[in-house]
Amino acid sequence: MARNTLSSRFRRVDIDEFDENKFVDEHEEAAAAAGEPGPDPCEVDGLLRQGDMLRAFHAALRNSPINTKNQAVKERAQGVVLKVLTNFKSSEIEQAVQSLDRNGIDLLMKYIYKGFEKPTENSSAVLLQWHEKALAVGGLGSIIRVLTARKTV
């Protein structure tokens, strides 16, 4: 048995700092300090005003907030992507989809299904056109990967 059992020197941990209501994830703090993830709305708007739809499309899909838990960031990114998708002409959709790799098509499908969850006026018809073209390029595997993915946009 230890000689000094009445000593309280071993109690150096402050258990009040580990209160679950005060818990702050360091990963989220680092992401907030490094800048918000997601597409840059100013860059995308500038490209849309110039009429460069393909570059606006790629800029909207770049830096997607997949790993963040912040719903406001995800909603803002969804709005930017939906704005780009609705500005495309139906004849240009196929070219834009074919410019993506497999991961890009999966990301596009995630945004399409997220748009189906919260439809706005005329967005469903546009999203169905995008879905048709993305399905033709990505196949059924892209739908399965999106529906079974744990990380959402």
UniProtKB/Swiss-Prot annotation:
Keywords: Actin-binding, Cytoplasm, Cytoskeleton, Phosphoprotein. One of its GO terms (biological process) is Arp2/3 complex-mediated actin nucleation. The modification Phosphoserine is found at residue 64. It is found in: Cytoplasm, Cytoskeleton. The keyword Membrane does not apply. SUPFAM superfamilies: Arp2/3 complex 16 kDa subunit ARPC5. GO terms for cellular component: Arp2/3 protein complex; cytoplasm; glutamatergic synapse; synapse. Transmembrane segments: none annotated. One of its GO terms (molecular function) is actin binding. Its main location: cytoplasm. It comes from the Eukaryota. The keyword Cytoplasm applies. InterPro entries: ARPC5, ARPC5_sf. PANTHER family: ARP2/3 COMPLEX 16 KD SUBUNIT P16-ARC (PTHR12644). May function as component of the Arp2/3 complex which is involved in regulation of actin polymerization and together with an activating nucleation-promoting factor (NPF) mediates the formation of branched actin networks. May be a component of the Arp2/3 complex in which it may replace ARPC5. Belongs to the ARPC5 family. This is Actin-related protein 2/3 complex subunit 5-like protein. The gene is Arpc5l.
